[in-house]
Amino acid sequence: MGLHRVDLRPFPVSRSPFMAQPSTTYKFELNLTDLDRGVYETVKQTIARHPSETEERMTVRLLAYAFWYNEQLSFGRGLSDVDEPALWEKSLDDRVLHWIEVGQPDADRLTWCSRRTERTSLLAYGSLRVWEGKVIPAIKNLKNVNVAAVPQEVLDVLAKDMPRVIKWDVMISEGTIFVTDDRGQHEVQLQWLTGERG
């Protein structure tokens, strides 16, 4: 496999002159059974939610964490720092192995992300028809970018009234995510728009 050339230039965006507001912290307890990858872990994390971050976005970050979990995967600063992703996996020598975005970034953002890492993944959510028609054709040639859509109906249920201590039992089988919380079990069937889980 050839070396992937990494571009370390910052993302070209204007910086806000306003002082950052404090984030809200959440406790996340994950009991993970990933039958597809043979991963069985119980993990506890403290999650910072940016003041402008919706419950839906934070929920998708948690889904991404469970779906691509490994010991090196961690949450980035995301909304508070455009030069970091929602999540990333780094090597011991600080190379970015896997860059994970959530939401509806434009093609320029995904292209920029793909140049900083060996692999880029996106969990998209929300009203995707216009975004998909514009962005997916523009990134089809990016071989290290994989994009999946989270179904909005189940996301609405998972994200509603998110408690400060979040406890999920997650089973992943044949690419489907089954999340059990204090309200029952929820099936998250991702729709792959380009690429695959990897």
Give the role of each language-model region.
Residues 1-18:
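N-terminal amphipathic/basic-hydrophobic helices that include classical n-h-c signal peptides
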